[in-house]
Design a protein with these regions (language model features):
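Residues immediately C-terminal
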Residues: 100-103, 124
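Walker B catalytic acidic pair
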Residues: 96-97
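Conserved Helicase C-terminal RecA-like lobe
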Residues: 1-14, 73, 86
Length: 184
């Protein structure tokens, strides 16, 4: 912000910590000389909340901060508002607990990665340094920078790093991960 590279921040966090970002982390860690407007997204919008949300689009020198629950990005209303915010600002978009975007098939993951491409800068945060699977890293890295891991798709990434086996479940054939390779 001080260097003029951003004028907006979109923080996406799990339900359990989203309010803490708004009430605790931002007031505690944002330096005093930065004038800012912070708004916490809520799914049911009152007139006051709508006024607060609209204030994020007023011109001025303030840093505009939108804090959203990750679940909001599973809804059209939430995605549309985040997209409007991103298109109106030079934004840093941060995902807290980035393992919430590990499933490449999930609608929410697809929405968040698409929104991330509209942000000037992206960051991921997690308190879980070890994932359940190396495959969990693909979409998190894709959010940061498409192609970062050198693969055009999740499936080419999976082919390189996962040992797959075909299994039958109720007459349906599916690929399951049975191990990993090329991890060094």
């Amino acid at each position: 912000y001080d260097k003029g590279k951003i004028n907006g921040v979109l923080i996406v966090a799990p339900k359990g910590v989203v309010k803490n970002w708004y009430e605790g982390e931002i007031p505690t860690h944002l330096v005093d000389h930065i004038e800012h407007k912070s708004v916490l997204w809520q799914s049911s919008i009152t007139q006051t909340q709508q006024k607060n949300l609209n204030s994020l689009f007023e011109t001025g020198e303030d840093l505009h901060i939108l804090v959203m629950n990750v679940e909001a990005l599973s809804t059209k209303k939430g995605v549309d508002f985040a997209a409007k915010f991103l298109s109106s600002h030079r934004t840093l978009m941060a995902i807290d607990e980035s393992t919430t975007i590990k499933n490449p098939e999930a609608k929410r993951t697809k929405n968040i990665c698409a929104l991330g491409r509209e942000a000037a800068y992206t960051r991921i945060l997690t308190g879980s340094p070890v994932t359940k699977s190396p495959l969990d890293l693909y979409k998190q890295c894709e959010f940061l920078c498409p192609g970062l891991l050198g693969h055009e798709s999740y499936y080419t990434f999976r082919t390189r790093y996962a040992v797959m086996r075909t299994a039958n479940f109720g007459g349906r054939s599916v690929q399951i991960v049975v191990g990993y390779r090329n991890l060094d």
